[in-house]
Amino acid sequence: MLPAQINQTKPPMFHDGEEKLPPNNYEKANNSFVLSYARDEWLQRKLIERESEYLEFRNLKIFCGTFNANGKSPTSIDISKWLCGGEPDPSAMKDCYVCSFQEIVDLNAANVIAEGHSAKRTTQWANMILQTLNQLAPIKIHESGGRNDFGGSFDSTSNKDDWSNGNGSRESGGSGGSGGSGGSSGSGETNNNRNSNHSKSSENEEHPQHETGAYRLIASKYLVGIAIVAFIKAEHVNNVGDVQVQTAGVGIGGFVGNKGAAALRFTYGNSSICAVSSHLSAHRGAVGSRNSDYNNILNKVQFKDRHTDGNNSSSSISILDHDYVFWLGDLNYRIQVDISTEECYRRIRSNKKTEKGQNDLVWLRSQDQLNIERAHGRVFELFEEGVLNFLPTYKYIPGEDVYDDRPEKKMRAPAWCDRVLWYCRMGNNSVNTMNSGGSGTKLIKQIKYQRENSIKISDHKPVYGTFDVQVKMIVKQEQKRVYNELMRGEWVI
């Protein structure tokens, strides 16, 4: 049978150079079974070797936004400017939206222990985003199972059972990943049974899907105050598959979810994408704790590898095993501790008034802890970030547009706590040379990196990055041609 998606992991017959025997006793296996197994492995390797003959790159526009909500409800705010990214033209709307939140609820003991409030607040944010996207974007009518937006010449690699036919119908959350309570919708990390009938349970009704709208919910996941939600344009639904969610608590005791991450993954065509929403340790002097949080999240977040031998239950996919990763959130890195709060304010305020002020902002960036730690290879060493050409996003007086330097309050030095970073497994500067004669487009390119000033409910400002991502799509006719050529040819183990 012609495979719809090529698994690029190690062939299941081999593991670290040692032979892995097929099920049952190898010596007693039927010869025809052994030959068939070996031929399948050979065919898999050859298809991967010749993938340039049947894969094509297409551009996917992705929005990644992060916001520390300071425990506030989203019901009374307008998030359209944030999601538009300064481009109100409907034609500028992105194909995929990933939104990360921190402190969706107050981080008190009751909310850390019980997940009910977190679930409700995650639903509120997801519904508001979906409603806003569908109001902003032009509505297109799509037939069920219809053509994708690339003209229908590509193979849809998504399995409808992988994500509830793309409608994001809600599942019970339960404990998710490593530490802390968590909940999900769209796809659970343990339950592979999907609701293909779109049943009208009370949980499903929490996530109305606006079936005639331009966008669909892919998945959502929360961990105490942390949440992540993802949406896709309706015309892209058939290209999405293998949606999974996970969490990692790294807070109190190294596992409680007051700090940590909620993550999701999905495939688009023949490319894999992961997004991580994280909230790292606070306080200006806790650089080492933040670095440790990052590494703990990297180790704890593991997704199920659904393409490996079914007998290998321990097989998993890490964050960095994906083609593209977006890491966003309140990373809590501050300005270096030896820079006084007063000096930070002086530099920021001069930036507003004089040409020299721009130099002041550049100097302040040089004192940013995350920039320093990355430069020394101690954290996010494989990730890239755009230039911080915007003012620090923390700490503001909620409801106002000014930094909180009130003398009666504990003054915090302004900082770029809220960040969006990205990673490309092929290399962050890699280009698409497939079918391009040796030159091509960068596999991932950041288009914009900015903060949004219109949202004032929090002591943080939202941040967003927009990206052009080159995803691989299978051209069915060409794949079939290569497959038939291999089947007709001679093969060797």
Identify the residue ranges that each predicted region occupies.
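Amphipathic alpha-helical protein-protein interaction segments
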Residues: 32, 53-55, 68-72, 90, ...
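General structural concept
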Residues: 60-140
